[in-house]
Amino acid sequence: MANVSTTLVSNMLALPQVASPARTLHGTKRVAMGTIALAAGDLSATDTVMLAPIPSNAAIVSIKLFNDDLDSGTTNTCDVGIYSESDGTFTALDDDAYASAITDLRAAVGGVGTDVTFEARNINTLGQRVWEDAGQSEDPGGYLFIGLLFDAAGDTAGDLSFVIEYVVN
């Protein structure tokens, strides 16, 4: 019979004990959440919607979207990614780090929402910091922004709500 342990367990049982990063064991969970009313003109191809600032050293646990039907047809697609900001201008670091060309905004989604955290992201990156999710070689410090980029336009105004859960040391 095999007994296999995660790194968290192996670190705890090691002699001397090895500390695991707080973002993966006993970290502080935080939440960013909100709602934005989107006009039909906010859903054009190449438009962006910034959801929330997240500390660059945080580890994203979950990104859930809840929305009205934002597309009366079947054209709306969007990415969920990471952006930096300078003087009010947002620059994509990885515009589809979490989700790529999702179609979830084409129909209303309530209830438990749609978790898009691993739609494009590999599950083995759980516990990785936001700056690493963005493909950066070092932590820029401060905040990075989680945002949506519309690849193909929607045409229906409505509300978009989000809940982003993340862990900090």
PLM features: residue spans?
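Surface-exposed, low-hydrophobicity beta-strand/loop segments enriched in small/polar/acidic residues
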Residues: 2-169
